[in-house]
């Protein structure tokens, strides 16, 4: 389904969530048919020396937190890569690495190349509203041999969502390597309060506006099963950060894998597990 600029402007100004959601769902189905993907992620702390036990169920091992130095970041990458085996390893937020490069007075590209040599495959996230120069930083990431797991929004900078999404479209036109965009903010900006209605609307508008990024993603661990299920009906096609825990202490139906599959099916879609490289895992 192709939506014209005039139609986008009308939809963005509308409070008719049903019409907006239907248009976004049509756009998602044109790209992904009936499939919705999800990835099970093991988070490990950025501090070197911490335990890393990567279960076979994890499709991605993600290093989270702010490294204290380039040396500490590289040391942690080597530890995690060794423990992860063949499981893809991502790590860090690109804005934190910008600041680290500045504090150590080295080029960002040099820092990223060090991480790549240590074994890192992907930078875990790049918050478009936090980076000092999103295009330059992502270009440096690409030149360093790394990929980007997802473009994110840290805290909505304003209520002008279409303007933000047009910025994302322009960024992808410049860099061309963004595989997934997670439009819902990681933290709440007190100046831009959010509701469930707003979140659903933002997901739908993201799918309609950001036509040059394949995947619109929702963080399962951050936003929960209910919003994730609704988001899948209005344009989202991927669920990030599902727990790799296979235990069923509260019963099989409450186990993370069964719960995410059930929610995807409830959205009338086909659950498909992927890994951190977006390769489909054996079902």
Feature-to-residue mapping (PLM):
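N-terminal capping/lid subdomain adjacent to the active-site entrance of alpha/beta enzymes
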Residues: 26, 33-53
């Amino acid at each position: 389904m192709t939506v014209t600029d005039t139609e986008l402007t009308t939809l963005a100004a509308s409070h008719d969530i049903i019409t907006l959601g239907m248009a976004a769902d049509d756009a998602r189905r044109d790209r992904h048919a009936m499939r919705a993907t999800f990835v099970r992620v093991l988070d490990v702390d950025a501090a070197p020396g911490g335990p890393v036990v990567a279960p076979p169920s994890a499709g991605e091992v993600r290093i989270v937190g702010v490294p204290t130095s380039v040396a500490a970041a590289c040391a942690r990458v080597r530890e995690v890569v060794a423990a992860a085996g063949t499981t893809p390893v991502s790590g860090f937020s690109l804005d934190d690495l910008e600041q680290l490069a500045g504090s150590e007075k080295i080029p960002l590209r040099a820092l990223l190349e060090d991480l790549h040599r240590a074994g890192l495959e992907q930078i875990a996230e790049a918050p478009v509203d936090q980076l000092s120069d999103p295009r330059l930083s992502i270009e440096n990431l690409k030149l360093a041999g790394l990929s980007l797991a997802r473009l994110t929004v840290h805290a909505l900078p304003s209520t002008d969502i279409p303007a933000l999404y047009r910025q994302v479209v322009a960024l992808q036109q410049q860099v061309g390597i963004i595989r997934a965009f997670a439009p819902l903010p990681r933290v709440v900006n007190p100046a831009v309060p959010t509701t469930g209605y707003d979140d659903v609307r933002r997901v739908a508008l993201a799918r309609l506006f950001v036509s040059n990024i394949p995947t619109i993603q929702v963080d399962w661990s951050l936003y929960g099963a209910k919003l994730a299920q609704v988001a899948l009906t209005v344009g989202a096609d991927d669920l990030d950060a599902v727990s790799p825990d296979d235990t069923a202490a509260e019963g099989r139906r409450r186990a993370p894998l069964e719960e995410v599959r059930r929610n995807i099916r409830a959205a009338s879609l086909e659950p498909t597990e992927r890994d951190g490289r977006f390769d489909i895992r054996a079902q």
